[in-house]
Amino acid sequence: MGLPWYRVHTAVINDPGRLLAVHLMHTALVLGWAGSMALYELAVFDPSDAVLNPMWRQGMFVLPFMTRLGVTHSWSGWTVTGEPWINEPGFLNAHFNFWSYEGVALMHIVLSGLFFLAAVWHWVYWDLDLFEDPRTGEPALDLPKIFGGHLFLLGFLCFNFGTFHLTGIFGPGMWVSDAYGLTGHIEHIAPEWGPAGFNPFNPGGVVAHHIAAGITLMIGGVFHLTARPPERLYTALRMGNVETALASAIAAVFGAAFVVAGTMWYGHVTTPIELFGPTRYQWDQGYFTQEIQRRVDSQLAEGASLSEAWSSIPEKLAFYDYVGNSPAKGGLFRVGAMDSGDGIAEEWLGHPVFQDGAGRALSVRRLPNFFENFPVILTDGDGVVRADIPFRRSESQYSFEQTGVTVSFYGGALDGQTFTNPSDVKKFARRAQLGEAFDFDTETLGSDGVFRTSTRGWFTFGHACFALLFFFGHIWHGARTLFRDVFAGIDADLGEQIEFGAFQKLGDLTTRKS
């Protein structure tokens, strides 16, 4: 036909069989990518330390999504929570449990192959009676009825996902955790039908809304399968034009993309920090700092020493309170996982407490999210600056040497140790600026010391960008179908006359090609 690359889709505009074929092929490609990507991630994933080297620091993208739906173990014998897994006989007594990372990946690949074969079949056998309008004998699609069918099927899947998979009636449930991402596990969830169900961090709301949305969609599907749209509405919204369906579908996709970009970036029960990493706002607001301090104060009130109080802090909680885990530290065009930046975390050094020569307890002002460099400033309990690392020594008034700053560690690997050498104290002050101090292995991966973003940042960036592109795609195709008669200069219902290649002379019905 000699069509340019950006016009090739016109080949399926009036060919329902092959329109179906290309959609089947698209689904096959998506399934194939998902399964292949899962196998690749499993090949490079290191499950040895679920606390300091979780999947979101290793740049895993599809594994977190599998995990939040209830997949937690691998055929290799490990689980995402750190416990070993004993492989028991599964389907047909085979020692391969298909509700595992490898099992789900392989099922996607097998299904991809089946969809590929279906696409080939429908491309070859495109001229089916199913797609023929009995009134005209021409290929046609009853788009309003197809819309109803899609609504019903979508509602059926949505309802069953909420009713069976999430509740555990026939399924594993979903990933749930506490507010600080410490106790993550898979759990059967009961639906929450009250106002609490609208809390974005209440898993019961996810179940209830899937059930309710499924019922609503099925009702809508039955309605559109049984009722015909009014003629004026059918004409006004160009319901007979497949480009209308395209514009509507794009709207659904970009709407969903904007929503999930928001739930990922701002945090939601479906995007737990144990699987996707903390949000940037948890660093901005000192979310984990406050919880750690609350726990320490509680221990001190019960008579514990500073060392005992800080030693009771879970290493996992301390690790969240580190700026290198904020997705906003990724920077533009910094490819790779977080581990490729600051390295693989090995151990918590402990909580540093600074003190000046006058005996005042000092704290280091922490690095804001959007700064790469920030002055090292130490303030007392009233916020008064008492020490710093000066840019110009000749004008220094608050240098560590002048103010006699020392540092003592409580909890962690350096528990009970005090450092008085100014060079050592400065080193730990620079680390304290980034949050809790950790030792990192930078040699294994050749880490370059430049922060990267987490899975949360990549997902948000990708979906926000594509949502914007699809938004303009919706405007483009929606305008084309609504104002087709204006753009083409003819009535919208005379599409046959301008079909490419149907007539020797465009629009002349007497020159139809046989």
Swiss-Prot record:
Record's keyword annotation contains DNA repair: no
Taxonomic superkingdom: Bacteria
Gene Ontology CC annotations of this record: photosystem II; plasma membrane-derived thylakoid membrane
Chain segments annotated as transmembrane: 21-36, 109-123, 148-164, 211-226, 245-260, 465-480
Annotated GO MF terms: chlorophyll binding; electron transporter, transferring electrons within the cyclic electron transport pathway of photosynthesis activity
Compartments reported by the entry: Cellular thylakoid membrane
Cofactor: how and how many bound: Binds multiple chlorophylls. PSII binds additional chlorophylls, carotenoids and specific lipids.
Membrane topology: Multi-pass membrane protein
Pfam families: PSII
GO terms, biological process: photosynthetic electron transport in photosystem II
Keywords: Chlorophyll, Chromophore, Membrane, Photosynthesis, Photosystem II, Thylakoid, Transmembrane, Transmembrane helix
Main location group: membrane
Xref: InterPro entries: PS_antenna-like, PS_II_antenna-like_sf, PSII_PsbB
Function, as annotated: One of the components of the core complex of photosystem II (PSII). It binds chlorophyll and helps catalyze the primary light-induced photochemical processes of PSII. PSII is a light-driven water:plastoquinone oxidoreductase, using light energy to abstract electrons from H(2)O, generating O(2) and a proton gradient subsequently used for ATP formation.
Subunit composition and interactions: PSII is composed of 1 copy each of membrane proteins PsbA, PsbB, PsbC, PsbD, PsbE, PsbF, PsbH, PsbI, PsbJ, PsbK, PsbL, PsbM, PsbT, PsbX, PsbY, PsbZ, Psb30/Ycf12, peripheral proteins PsbO, CyanoQ (PsbQ), PsbU, PsbV and a large number of cofactors. It forms dimeric complexes.
Family classification: Belongs to the PsbB/PsbC family. PsbB subfamily.
Protein name as annotated: Photosystem II CP47 reaction center protein
